[in-house]
């Protein structure tokens, strides 16, 4: 009684077909996974390339926010600076020198512009309260007129 040793030689192509088929399926499934992720990513990219935003309705009767103290200073400084330096036309240059001047000014020098800004801010708050009252009363009037026309 002799024992036979298992075959440890190279496998024939017909025998390896089953295992290669498994490998092919594994490769195909991973390609499918890559393809599916690509398909999922493509719709996410489309809105970035061509974003179409809805037009924002601007309420033209709404009061505009007031400028800060620095902008009131900028107006005065720009006029004075252009008179002294007519050759400088660049707003960048004017803005840069204005910012430097504003930083070096003392509080006492800035008070004038802070006062103007607070006055404008108070006017804005008054105008906003009037505007909100008009909008609230106007909204109720519009709803009543809409109901009259719908009958």
UniProtKB/Swiss-Prot annotation:
SUPFAM superfamilies: HMG-box (SSF47095). The keyword Secreted does not apply. GO terms for cellular component: chromatin; nucleus. GO terms for biological process: chromatin organization. Residues 63-132 bind DNA. Coiled coil: none annotated. It is found in: Nucleus. The keyword DNA-binding applies. One of its GO terms (molecular function) is DNA binding. This is High mobility group B protein 14. It comes from Arabidopsis thaliana.
């Amino acid at each position: 009684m002799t024992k036979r040793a298992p075959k440890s030689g190279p496998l024939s192509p017909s025998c390896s077909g089953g295992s290669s088929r498994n490998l092919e399926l594994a490769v195909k499934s991973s390609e499918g996974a890559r393809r599916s992720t690509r398909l999922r990513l493509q719709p996410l990219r489309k809105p970035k390339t061509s974003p179409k935003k809805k037009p924002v309705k601007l309420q033209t009767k709404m009061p505009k926010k007031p400028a800060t103290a620095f902008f009131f200073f900028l107006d005065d400084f720009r006029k004075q600076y252009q008179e002294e330096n007519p050759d400088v036309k660049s707003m960048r240059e004017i803005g840069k020198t204005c910012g430097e001047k504003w930083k070096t000014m003392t509080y006492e020098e800035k008070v004038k512009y802070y006062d103007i800004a607070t006055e404008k801010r108070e006017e804005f708050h008054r105008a906003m309260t009037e505007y909100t009252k008009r909008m609230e009363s106007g909204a109720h009037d519009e709803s009543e007129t809409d109901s009259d026309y719908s009958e």
